[in-house]
Amino acid sequence: MKNYVAKLRENEEKGFSLVELIIVMAIMAILVGIVASQVLPYMDKSRQSKDQQQLSSVCTNLVSAVAQSGKDLPDVSGADVKTLDGSQTPLAGNTDWTTVGANFKDLNGGAITSDGLNGKLGSKNGKGQAVLFDYDSATGEIKVYVTGHGSDDADSSKYIVVSK
């Protein structure tokens, strides 16, 4: 009897069987799926928060640029940030806004293009969208927002920053 048990122990295979490995891999795949479904929404919320901070920075720089110009500026609605250089409508030919554009360019580190700002927007709602602004001369209020959410006005934008 002792010889029989000794022979069984000698012939005993070491390691895991293929079935055991497949079961472990299936369990791991299920766990990864559960974790990913819980983490992905938080990642997009983080990107949205970062986009909001980028727009807030643009709004702050625009408010500073308007204040530095010291000019009475006309109202603007739905102007792309890249129009601050005065080359495109609705700001074309308006030297007061061109001064603001030069100030904004200095404050923004030279990035005056909407494309340059879009590279900083990382959420799915912000990527590839134009960065627009409105200016109300009566109140001095500036709204900076992202297009592409049904229409190109501030009220329909998912991302909007209003100067106080």
Please give the residue ranges for each predicted region.
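N-terminal single-pass transmembrane signal-anchor helix
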Residues: 13-39
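N-terminal leader/signal peptides at the extreme start of proteins
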Residues: 1-16
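Amphipathic alpha-helical segments that mediate coupling or scaffolding at interfaces
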Residues: 7, 21, 42-45
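Aliphatic-rich helix starts adjacent to a transmembrane/signal segment
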Residues: 38-59
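Short, surface-exposed interaction loops/tails
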Residues: 123-164
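Surface-exposed intrinsically disordered loops and tails
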Residues: 80-126, 154
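Alpha-helix exit/C-cap motif
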Residues: 60-82
